[in-house]
């Protein structure tokens, strides 16, 4: 069966059981029983409890739960309670971040318009848009939102803003012509689409689709079917947690075997192995990562980037492709006059001289032959006409004043057949008709041309020169209007026959220009190893002009249209996308396929946009970024991040923040794991040597939950490093647990473990197990506090200004030092923490062993750095 836009109006009326005079109440009832209400169905939303329990799916958390259960079974209620408390706090934090349920479908539902004017029982009535049915006849005029999809059956110069749906910045001229061939959404000139706006003219349409069957409804379906994806950090932490748990279980199993071999009871050996597992697993890791990410969202909010999904903070830092919408994202979403062409000369809009007679005349005529208004910043009318009004305002020529001085005495409205508009005014005592329209149409009716020397007969050479300039403007993506005029006898009624014998005055070229920051932002992306790609519903030439101006497109061979990829297989598209930097005339489905093709190549994809048409692709992409000022609620709700200033440059800053944040999280993880590895080595060495266990469970819990958490959070707040934007994005499948990262953790843990073991032996030899355990506890605590300075950079920092530039780390170090010193020296704490109260000499010994790990690790960093530089030569 033919599509509705390919059928004659009579065929459409028969197909939907409608008629031009509208439906009767009985017909409305039958249609509603068949098609339902004009609304969108909502997806099933997760409840708070479901979201809360989903926080326990992490493999590391499951290991901790198992450890808590086993600890409780063997009587270690203290350890079990602490573990349960920590993972519960983490689950609450995660729930708070994700409890904002998706509102995309509700936004789409609201977009369909609250009310509609419709013909019912032969009369015009206004009803809630929800009550529309297929077959209804709707009446539309400038300013109306279209409440349902429909076929145009009456047209009076109707123009529709479809930018939110198709991405095309210019209002679309509608007509009733039947389209015989297949046409993309943006080229169906006889159709009206739900959620679009009437900018000019009037019309009637027969409703052909409502609710989920409209083009907006189909996008709603795509939103429901597009699955949520894990961000790179989620993937990395999941892999990391499993590997870490396996390593710890191997260590604990080895220790269990050693203790059984030494003759200990199986229950005691097993309990100790579980205790060690609890000590080794960084209970606070997930919470710390969540807290650091939360701080990141607060920082980014101050820089105009609102994070809706927590992990998107990190995900932005790892993107390798940004697929950006054109209209309103890279451009201002506002038509602006760029150039004049008068008397054979091109004049920039910035260089217009209103003291020049011809330029002032063209400015006035563009305001007079114009139906748009801009009062108190409220623009009403066609965006092209509004651009002409705004240009006048820039030069102090206000539309209201000009129109009052030269009132309109007659008009011939624009229509798609004539492609011109005419108005009649009394100017300087002459009855002047101003005609604007398409260049080729007006040149055919032009007999004279204005020049500085005076008005003379236009020649073929003049016309060819004007056409060449028109083509040049068009190749630059500019929309061009020609302006002509003639004198009409007074008291004459205008007809289309009067649009002849015209005097050519000039051309005005305009476009939706790039944002001022876009070019620099694109250059910064390229410098950072990120591939910018423009995807738009606009025309190829217009889009290519913008893409070239901002630096995305260098050659037209890098541009294509949606039709070029329509029939490509997934594999073909995967091979095709690296060669293309700009896609024009695309549909929402095309956007999803393009994003998926890049993902199949191992790229982490950002999709930016602001229209309804962007929403499904925003969800398909790894990170969806919506515009907050010009963006629809649909796009905002589908996105992981919303830019409150609609500034493409904010994305670049967000990428920089994301990269810094990911590095800071790595520093925090390095800090936690190397310290825990030091504790494991100390316990393992003591067990192998047949010595008493150096730590009581309360020692390990004190370290993990108090003196570890604060420095780890502080490391997550390390000041930004600008050099991160000179680095390439990390690989999509790169785990946090790289060989280099593991080797650093192992080496640093070895140093901390060695100093702790030496300290334990010192105290043990002085006064037995309790003093040795106290020495080991104090040394491990303080060594890990000093270790925070080791983890703040991959390079040595001990003799640099950067050592103390993190105020949060200074605070964490001071607080942690005060806590452990109080526990070791105040007599009242010795029973609670199972320590021996230390004198000043003993405390100094503990501090010395703890501090020694700092210069040793810094020396090892310096050696690694030198070896790496030598290897790069």
What are these regions, as identified by a protein language model?
Residues 707, 752, 774-788:
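Generic alpha-helical transmembrane segments
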Residues 370, 602, 655, 659, ...:
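Alpha-helix capping/termination and helix-coil
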Residues 1-726, 736-737, 750, 777, ...:
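Conserved cytosolic headpiece of P-type ATPases
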Residues 687-696, 760-772:
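Helix-coil boundary and interhelical linker segments in multi-pass alpha-helical membrane proteins
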Residues 731-750, 770-775:
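Membrane-water interface at loop-to-transmembrane-helix junctions
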